[in-house]
Design a protein with these regions (language model features):
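An alpha-helical, amphipathic repeat domain used for nucleic-acid recognition
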Residues: 1-174
Length: 174
């Protein structure tokens, strides 16, 4: 009997895909959480939402809270670290308002968002200028060009003060 025939016969012995899934041992919540955190950092709310989908009928829902506390105690789950990482990575493309919105979507508390954005304080005009220069060249000459750039920067979450500085060609904050 060939190797291919053996593999096919074993696969047919296991039944359908649904039957194979039922016999597959389920992962614990802790191992799922560690696997998710190994890929990228998560906020507590985001990880809780993802893990809640995997709580079985026979599992205690309070186990999720214990897993999150254990991960926090071991330093694997930190909303402060997550907020800082998101703020740093998004600061290359977005303004403070958009970063604040994204952090709120991830379930980060407003005080942690403010602390993460405080580390970026004073850089918004420079970041807006950088984003604008990647998309446009030179200073706008017509009102239509100014409006187009202002809409673009506003859609990226930059403040009006920063937008006006970019449109006027100022390099120093007022």
């Amino acid at each position: 009997m060939s190797l291919c025939a053996v593999l096919l016969s074993r696969r047919s012995d296991l039944g359908t895909k649904a039957e194979r899934q039922r016999h597959k041992p389920s992962k614990s919540l802790l191992s799922r959480a560690i696997a998710l955190l190994a890929r990228r950092d998560h906020s507590r709310a985001e990880l809780s939402r993802k893990l809640a989908r995997h709580i079985g009928e026979d599992e205690d829902p309070s186990e999720l809270g214990r897993v999150l506390v254990e991960l926090g105690r071991n330093g694997l789950l930190s909303d402060e670290r997550f907020a800082g990482a998101v703020a740093r990575s998004r600061s290359q493309r977005f303004g403070d308002a958009r970063i604040r919105y994204d952090l709120r979507r991830f379930g980060i508390a407003d005080d942690l968002s403010a602390a993460a954005l405080a580390k970026l304080a004073g850089t918004e005009a420079a970041r807006a200028r950088e984003v604008s220069s990647r998309r446009f060249t030179g200073l706008p000459t017509t009102a239509a060009e100014r409006a187009k750039r202002a809409r673009f920067l506003q859609s990226r979450g930059f403040s009006l003060d920063s937008i006006y500085q970019v449109l006027r060609g100022r390099t120093d904050p007022e």
